[in-house]
Design a protein with these regions (language model features):
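Gram-negative bacterial Sec-dependent N-terminal signal peptides
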Residues: 10-12
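Bacterial signal peptide processing site
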Residues: 22-24
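N-terminal module-boundary/linker segments of secreted carbohydrate-active enzymes
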Residues: 30, 42-106
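Active-site-adjacent substructure of cysteine-protease-like catalytic cores
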Residues: 149-176
Length: 252
């Protein structure tokens, strides 16, 4: 009987030891998982960040670049802000978020509203521009400028959807349909010769940049990567127009 008690006690100790070892391994796994998730960022967190937020390269690498290039429906809160002369149904618009490099070589969150038919294409184009470190100074939504195109061009804001007419007309712009992008507009202005011989330059502060024979930074021409990417995806460039020139403008 005494020997039997000893055997039972030894068996019990062995079971306790195995259970302890098993729990320790489970604890290690939980610890490893906790450490892994601590270095990544939830996509929902990214979409709540304001456009213009600086993103450290190490964080982008840890998260994975694809998390920063997204397409989503227009949210209720955003639609409430946007409602101003809209001619496109909300269901036909998309909210895209991307990364871009500014002129000081810093990585920022950017965003724009566009038509759903070009949303995935724009995300692809901006991802290629980002990988190439193509400089885009600013990319925020036009309602921050009261949808004033002159104001956002002077601020060199890159944008797509903006509910407005073509300046000087009652014709709705391609931007009002979310089918055109203006890229680094201050350095790539619109201009045309008036009947009196004077020039109409937009933005008005861009007169140093309408002469495309000059060399300067951020100029879009036929050798520019943005031109090549946009046109390869079926966009037309305003710099190729005949009666006027719109070097910032790509449309579908």
């Amino acid at each position: 009987m005494h020997s039997r008690h000893i055997i039972l006690i030894v068996a019990a100790i062995a079971v306790i030891a195995l259970a302890s070892c098993h729990n320790e391994k489970k604890s290690e796994k939980r610890s490893d998982t906790s450490n892994t998730t601590a270095t990544t960022t939830d996509t929902t967190t990214l979409t709540k960040k304001k456009a213009g937020t600086t993103e450290p390269p190490k964080q982008i690498e840890a998260d994975g670049i694809d998390k920063y290039f997204t397409v989503a429906p227009v949210s209720d809160s955003l639609w409430g802000i946007m409602q101003n002369n809209n001619i496109v149904n909300r269901k036909d618009l998309r909210h895209i978020r991307v990364l871009h490099w500014d002129f000081d070589n810093k990585s920022h969150q950017g965003e724009m509203i566009c038509h759903r038919s070009i949303a995935d294409t724009l995300v692809q184009i901006f991802k290629e521009l980002y990988k190439a470190k193509y400089p885009i100074q600013r990319m925020v939504l036009p309602h921050l400028y009261g949808n004033d195109d002159e104001a956002q061009m002077q601020d060199n804001n890159t944008s797509c959807y903006c509910p407005r007419t073509v300046k000087g007309t009652t014709v709705m712009s391609k931007h009002a349909r979310g089918l055109a992008v203006d890229l680094n507009p201050l350095y790539n202005p619109y201009y045309r010769a008036k009947k009196d011989g004077s020039l109409d330059v937009q933005p008005s502060t861009a007169t140093p940049f309408f002469d495309r024979e000059k060399e300067f930074d951020y100029k879009i021409d036929h050798n520019d990567l943005a031109y090549k990417l946009f046109t390869s995806h079926g966009f037309r460039w305003g710099g190729d127009w005949k009666t006027c020139k719109d070097y910032q403008h790509f449309e579908r």
